[in-house]
A protein has these predicted regions:
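Alpha-helical transmembrane segments of multi-pass inner-membrane proteins
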Residues: 1, 5-188
């Protein structure tokens, strides 16, 4: 007999790992070294080391994989609990992606922005949640910009992160995404 494979548990495990790596990357960016990883690093490596993954490029590549998975989890969440847990994982991964300091991570995020609408175009509910997800991303970028103004930065940031975390960029983009979310709700 054929069994259908339940991929929820691997998805949950991946999102949990990505969320933890992202939160650790975020607090590392602001100068908190929970596990003493920075003690034996050379001065030249201090600005490029993030989370348990080490190199910022590897960390950024990992989060480029986690970013669409987190968006997909919230798009397909069924029930309030699943939606809230997916949203929490998504916000963690968004913060982690912002501190990656890798231009390749930024390109991966832009690829997600292009590919997801093409795949989801025929599903109005999924498109609506995608718009909400991008709205949350830009609000996360805005909050990151606020935090960056008052907390010390210990790692490098990509040009993309510096630009998108400015209020003049993040707030209009968040408002546009939320407006699209409302419009898609009225159309559906």
């Amino acid at each position: 007999s054929r069994r259908e494979i339940d991929l929820r548990w691997p998805l949950i495990a991946f999102l949990l790992a990505a969320s933890l790596a992202s939160v650790l990357g975020l607090i590392n960016h602001f100068g908190v070294d929970l596990f003493g990883f920075y003690q034996n690093l050379r001065a030249a490596d201090l600005g490029r080391f993030l989370s348990t993954l080490g190199n910022a490029d590897f960390y950024g590549s990992y989060l480029v994989l986690a970013f669409p998975v987190a968006l997909n989890a919230i798009i397909h969440a069924d029930g309030r609990r699943s939606f809230m847990l997916s949203a929490a994982a998504m916000v963690c991964v968004f913060f982690g992606a912002l501190v990656a300091g890798s231009d390749s991570a930024a390109l991966g995020l832009l690829a997600t922005a292009v590919v997801f609408p093409l795949v989801l175009f025929n599903d109005a509910s999924a498109m609506r949640r995608l718009a909400l997800g991008w709205g949350v991303f830009f609000l996360t970028a805005f909050v990151f910009g606020l935090l960056s103004a008052v907390l010390p930065s210990k790692t490098y940031l990509s040009f993309f992160t510096v630009a998108v975390s400015r209020a003049v960029v993040s707030l209009p983009l968040a408002a546009t995404a939320v407006a699209l979310w409302f419009l898609l709700g009225r159309a559906g």
